[in-house]
């Protein structure tokens, strides 16, 4: 779907022009309407499931402090499975999609071990190492400046748009064994989090049921796999990534929060009744566009052309 591609698009623009933003919203709505036509016409692959994953990782130096050398590490590689993340001390590996069945999980594990090894070898050439951990315990607030943001226009544009929407510094309050209350003037707090993210391709007619199942099992899976008790020197939740993920890019003003406006980043608040269309339509209706994008797609013409 064209709209979902745009949501992760690197070629974004930071235009503040209202006309451009309205045109972008119209393009998103056209994409969603084209998606609806595809669902009604049963134009998606069915009867098959695939699984894939992303692995985010930290780059660290000999003292286990963050090593901001990701661009240099990637410059020495020709492996397109490895790419940047928000911070210069993070990398991301995208594993190959596989048919769901047989030894797919073992094959996924084997590839993960192999690609992390590739990253580790390249990192060593820059005097760094790869570490898989939810939140790096040695992170300090001074590591989270814009000087450690990956030099990609997309990230800076997102940072500026979020800050403008927020209308001030980002405020984080997390209470656990200790308490962390801090403000930050950019979105780099989000770079404290890394994770292993599974992607699961299913048929359109089974999407709603399996999406709801995923929401049900999220809590016990997190309870069985927590590993992020420390953030900026404080002992917080056993899985502090949950709290940090929700708060670090919360662009709502205090007035919007008081009125109960839904956060842009959340873990879901309702079941899906019929299809994925419900998610896209609700997001477009509730959230303002942050960034535009130069586009030339015509989804309905593309559908007609096959």
Can you say where each PLM-predicted feature lies in the sequence?
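Phosphate/nucleotide-binding catalytic core
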Residues: 1-306
């Amino acid at each position: 779907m064209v709209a979902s591609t745009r949501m992760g698009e690197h070629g974004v623009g930071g235009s503040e022009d209202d006309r451009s933003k309205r045109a972008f919203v119209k393009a998103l709505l056209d994409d969603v309407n084209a998606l609806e036509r595809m669902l009604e016409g049963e134009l998606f692959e069915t009867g098959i499931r695939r699984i894939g994953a992303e692995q985010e990782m930290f780059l660290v130096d000999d003292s286990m402090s963050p090593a901001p050398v990701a661009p240099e590490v990637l410059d020495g590689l020709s492996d397109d499975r490895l790419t940047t993340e928000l911070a210069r001390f993070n990398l991301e590996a995208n594993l190959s999609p596989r048919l769901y069945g047989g030894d797919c999980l073992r094959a996924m594990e084997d590839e993960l071990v192999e690609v992390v090894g590739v990253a580790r070898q390249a990192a060593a050439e820059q005097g760094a190492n790869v570490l898989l951990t939810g939140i790096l315990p040695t992170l300090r607030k001074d590591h989270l400046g814009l000087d450690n943001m990956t030099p990609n226009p997309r990230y800076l544009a997102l940072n500026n748009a979020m800050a403008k929407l927020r209308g001030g510094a980002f405020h984080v309050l997390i209470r656990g064994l200790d308490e962390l209350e801090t403000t930050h003037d950019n979105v780099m707090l989000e770079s404290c989090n890394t994770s292993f993210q599974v992607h699961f391709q299913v048929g359109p007619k089974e999407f709603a049921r399996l999406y709801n199942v995923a929401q049900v099992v999220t809590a016990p899976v997190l309870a069985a796999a927590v590993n992020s008790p420390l953030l900026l020197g404080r002992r917080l939740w056993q899985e502090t990534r949950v709290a940090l993920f929700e708060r670090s890019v919360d662009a709502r003003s205090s007035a919007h929060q008081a009125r109960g406006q839904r956060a842009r980043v959340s873990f879901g608040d309702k079941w899906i009744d019929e299809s994925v269309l419900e998610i896209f339509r609700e997001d477009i209706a509730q959230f303002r566009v942050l960034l535009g994008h130069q586009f030339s797609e015509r989804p309905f013409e593309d559908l007609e052309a096959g």
